[in-house]
A protein has these predicted regions:
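Extended, charge-rich alpha-helical interface modules
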Residues: 2-97
Length: 97
C-alpha cells in the first residue's frame, strides 16, 4: 500500500482536470455511491472527496488512507480545486503511509 500511495502522491494527484470535467456528471456520483455501498462506506462527503475516493478506487489504492485522514484531520471537507490543496492531500497520504 505504501508504494501505491507514494506513486499516487508523486503524480500530484493528476486526476484534478478529470474530476473538474466530471463535476456535473450525475453518473459519477451514482457509480461512486454504488461502490461505496458495496464496501460498506457512507457517501456523505463533499464532491471533492467523492472524486478523490472514486479515483483511488479505480487506481486500486487503499481507501483506508483517505478515510483515516478524513476522520482524524477533518480537513478534507473544506478542500478547494487548487493544485496547492491537491499537493497537501498528496503529502498527507505519504505521511499516513
Amino acid at each position: 500500500m505504501k508504494n501505491q500511495i507514494n506513486s499516487y502522491a508523486q503524480a500530484r494527484i493528476s486526476f484534478y482536470e478529470a474530476s473538474l470535467q466530471r463535476k456535473n456528471t450525475p453518473q459519477l456520483v451514482d457509480e461512486f455511491n454504488q461502490l461505496a455501498q458495496s464496501r460498506g462506506w457512507t457517501a456523505e462527503r463533499s464532491y471533492f472527496s467523492t472524486a478523490l475516493i472514486y479515483e483511488m478506487l479505480h487506481r486500486d489504492i487503499d481507501i483506508s488512507a483517505i478515510a483515516i485522514w478524513d476522520n482524524e484531520k477533518e480537513k478534507i471537507h473544506s478542500l478547494h480545486y487548487t493544485q496547492v490543496r491537491l499537493d497537501e492531500v498528496a503529502k498527507s497520504l505519504v505521511t499516513l503511509s
